[in-house]
């Protein structure tokens, strides 16, 4: 409540900052921090899409549309509980019937096995990305704490500027106290914003998801290469 009242006072009783300023480092880091903080939901949506595309979206709709052209409704239900990889594995398993050509059966068997492995690799990818989504959720709380410290820094700057503008020698002790509070708050806030941005923050999440995606696609290629 005290901070809220202070923010109201700062809006009503505006001052021109002549003697105090945030450092260039602070302003540069804050610019990046705010950009990333404001795009966290987009990042989460993007990761969620990577985790779920095999169960829905335009890719699955196209597959179902193609199947509907050649399959009955009961046949469609055969694929309804499968992801696109498992679904294609089932299609290929149907080509391993003993009354089919041996060459077709062999291709069907190998391809079915490959896509079953791809489906398992995707499940692993999804599980690992799920942990990154949990990191993003915890980062929302970190952003709230960081924004609170940013507000504190603004308040200290405001109070320091007013104390300096009073030009009263008797206020020098208060000026020194507020100067220390302001500088310490700036330092803490920069550190918190850098943590949010860097390897322990959003950059780390994006890097790990990228690496997980590389690993998944490499495993997929290996599985398909074995069908040759």
Swiss-Prot record:
Any one of the GO BP annotations: sporulation resulting in formation of a cellular spore
Keywords from the UniProt entry: Glycoprotein, Sporulation
Keyword Iron part of the UniProt annotation: no
The keyword Ribosomal protein belongs to this UniProt entry's keyword annotation: no
GO cellular component: spore wall
Compartments where located: Spore wall
Highest taxon of the lineage: Eukaryota
Residues with glycosylation annotation: 117
InterPro entries per UniProt: AH/BAR_dom_sf
Family per similarity comment: Belongs to the SWP12 family.
Name of this chain's protein: Spore wall protein 12
């Amino acid at each position: 409540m005290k901070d809220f009242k202070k923010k109201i006072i700062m809006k009503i009783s505006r001052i021109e900052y002549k003697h105090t300023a945030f450092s260039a480092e602070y302003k540069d880091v804050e610019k990046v921090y705010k950009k990333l903080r404001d795009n966290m939901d987009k990042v989460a949506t993007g990761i969620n899409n990577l985790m779920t595309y095999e169960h829905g979206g335009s890719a699955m709709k196209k597959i179902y549309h193609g199947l509907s052209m050649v399959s009955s409704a009961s046949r469609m239900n055969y694929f309804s509980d499968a992801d696109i990889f498992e679904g294609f594995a089932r299609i290929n398993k149907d080509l391993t019937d003993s009354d089919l050509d041996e060459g077709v059966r062999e291709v069907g068997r190998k391809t079915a096995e490959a896509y079953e492995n791809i489906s398992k690799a995707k499940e692993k990818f999804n599980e690992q990305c799920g942990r990154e989504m949990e990191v993003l959720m915890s980062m929302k709380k970190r952003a709230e704490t960081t924004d609170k410290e940013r507000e504190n820094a603004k308040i200290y700057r405001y109070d320091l500027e007013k104390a300096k503008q009073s030009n009263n020698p008797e206020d020098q002790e208060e000026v020194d106290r507020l100067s220390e509070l302001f500088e310490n708050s700036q330092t803490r806030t920069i550190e918190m914003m850098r943590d949010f941005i860097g390897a322990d923050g959003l950059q780390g999440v994006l890097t790990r998801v990228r690496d997980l995606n590389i690993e998944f696609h490499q495993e997929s290629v290996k599985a398909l290469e074995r069908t040759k």
